[in-house]
UniProtKB/Swiss-Prot annotation:
Gene: ef1b
PANTHER family: ELONGATION FACTOR 1-BETA
Domain of life (superkingdom): Archaea
Protein name: Elongation factor 1-beta
Organism lineage: Archaea, Thermoproteota, Thermoprotei, Sulfolobales, Sulfolobaceae
InterPro entries recorded: eEF-1beta-like_sf (IPR036219), EF1B_bsu/dsu_GNE (IPR014038), Transl_elong_EF1B/ribsomal_bS6 (IPR014717), Transl_elong_EF1B_B_arc (IPR004542)
Amino acid sequence: MTDVLVVLKVFPDSDEVNLDNLYTDISSKLPKEYKIIRKETEPIAFGLNALILYVQMPEQTEGGTDNLEEVVNNIQGVSHAEVVGITRLGF
C-alpha cells in the first residue's frame, strides 16, 4: 500500500494562538497511521501566521483527506484547515 503526502494549511482563530502548542495538539490527535513529516509557518496578514503541515497518510484512507481536515478543524484554536496539495509517495 502506498502513502500520500498531504500539505495542510491550518489557520489559527487568532494571533494569540501559540503555533507550537497547536502543532502539539494536532500531532497528538491524528490517527496513528498519520505522520507529520514537516511543519512550517506562513505569514498571512497583520501578524497572523498559518501553520503548514506535511502529513504522510495511507493512500487508501476511506474518505480521502476529509478525515484529516475534520480532525484538525475540531481542535481548539483552529479557525479552519484546508488541503493545499497532495502527492503520491512511491510507486
